[in-house]
Each structure stands twice: as C-alpha cells, then as structure tokens.
C-alpha cells in the first residue's frame, strides 16, 4: 500500500550508527561492491566520522562518534548493537510536514548537532527531527536547498 502523503518526495538518506566507520565501510565494499576508497568525512562540530555513499539511488551514512559519549556511541550503547539510526525523508515543504506530524501527535526532538528544535538550516537543507521513534528508528525531515539557497547557507558545512 502506498502512502498518500503528497509532501514526502522519498528517502534522502539512511544513517547507520556504527562503532567503526572504516570497518563498516569494508563490509559494504566486500558484500555490496561499494567503492572501498569511499572517503570518510570528519565533522569536528558534531564530533563524528561519516562514510557516505550511494546504493540503489539512496544515500547511506555510516556514522561513528569520535567520543565515547557521542551521539552514535550512546545510541549503540543504549541498544547494545549497531544499526539503523534514522531515516531522513525529503519533503517539499518542511513546515507542512511538521504541521502534519504534530497534528497527528508527534513531538519535535532537538537536533543533536545544532542543539535546536524544529526547522533550522543544515548543510544541505532545512531539517527537523521527530521525538517519536517509529519502530526504534528516528525520523528526520529535510527540505533540500535550491542551488541559490545552497550558496546562502554555505556556513553550515561541516556540522
């Protein structure tokens, strides 16, 4: 059955919490032919290392905390295993997506990288997180910037 939500365009990315991004990337390289030379980006502001690649048209992020009490390390410790941390849904209108979710009882979660609630600028677009997990998976909405907006929000790179 297909969703009738006209605001959701599709999956922007899926983020996996891993203990070791390099090791996890090695498994994806062996089993799914993801290029082994995929770069692992370091994000000093949020203190994460992230291997980013595309598979089947979907962006995958293998996210490793650089500190023991970091966002992804805590998530792994709470659950006792690595796994799918969140799915980011690309939306046409983030305010409409949030209004719909909140009308259905959803609460907003603080963005752990920015310490902000609700819609706010991020490197690729406006984002917001729901506090309510769906089957143990966090939900993120992103309204991707237009090319003009991308230049305007260049300062948010590296979060």
Enumerate the language-model features and the residues they cover.
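Short, structured motif recognition centered on aromatic/hydrophobic residues
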Residues: 11, 15, 28, 53, ...
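Helix-adjacent hinge/juxtasegments
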Residues: 62-90
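Vicinal oxygen chelate
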Residues: 2-5, 18-26, 30-36, 52-53, 61, 79-159
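An N-terminus-focused feature that recognizes amino-terminal "leader" regions
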Residues: 27-31, 38-47, 67, 143
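N-terminal strand-loop-strand beta-hairpin
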Residues: 34-55, 59, 131
């Amino acid at each position: 059955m297909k969703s009738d939500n006209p605001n959701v365009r599709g999956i922007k990315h899926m983020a996996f919490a891993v203990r070791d991004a390099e090791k996890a990337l090695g498994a994806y390289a062996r089993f799914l032919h993801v290029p082994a030379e995929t770069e692992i980006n370091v994000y000093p502001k949020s203190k994460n290392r992230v291997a980013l690649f595309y598979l089947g048209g979907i962006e995958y992020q293998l996210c490793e905390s650089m500190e023991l009490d970091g966002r992804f390390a805590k998530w792994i410790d709470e659950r006792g295993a690595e796994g799918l941390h969140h799915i980011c849904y690309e939306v046409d209108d983030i305010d409409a997506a949030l209004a719909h979710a909140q009308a259905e009882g959803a609460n907003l979660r603080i963005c752990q990288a920015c310490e902000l609630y609700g819609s706010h600028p991020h490197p690729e677009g406006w984002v917001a997180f729901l506090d309510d997990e769906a089957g143990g998976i966090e939900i993120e909405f992103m309204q991707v910037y237009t090319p003009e907006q991308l230049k305007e929000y260049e300062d948010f790179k590296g979060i």
